């Protein structure tokens, strides 16, 4: 599975709780490869913030080629993301991480621990 860096367009963005945002991104090449448990790195458009923000993929729609990320606004980078509107774009890198081996876990008890906001 190849990591891809691409420009991704915001399809929809909304605040779903105090300081928690949900964003759908158009990312066909990443969406077709992504597995549960993986994440993307989202790059700020403000060039003063060099490091991307790692954000878990919350939902994948392979047919539409879209990804949903849910994140907490905690600093300048995620604050910038929270102000994005449909049609805005960000560079993203992904899919990253090993994901969850869903097929291997069928019929077994599994313990999962989430970090961040638990998505």
Model-found features: residue ranges?
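Ferredoxin-reductase
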Residues: 2-86
């Amino acid at each position: 599975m190849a990591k891809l860096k691409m420009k991704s367009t915001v399809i929809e963005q909304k605040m779903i709780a105090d300081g928690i945002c949900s964003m759908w991104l158009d990312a066909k090449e990443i969406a077709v490869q992504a597995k549960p448990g993986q994440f993307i790195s989202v790059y700020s458009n403000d060039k003063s913030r060099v490091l991307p923000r790692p954000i878990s993929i919350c939902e994948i729609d392979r047919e539409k080629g879209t990804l949903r990320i849910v994140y907490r606004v905690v600093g300048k980078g995620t604050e910038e993301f929270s102000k994005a509107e449909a049609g805005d774009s960000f560079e993203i890198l992904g899919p990253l991480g090993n994901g969850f081996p869903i097929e291997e876990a069928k019929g077994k008890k599994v313990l999962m621990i989430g970090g961040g906001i638990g998505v």
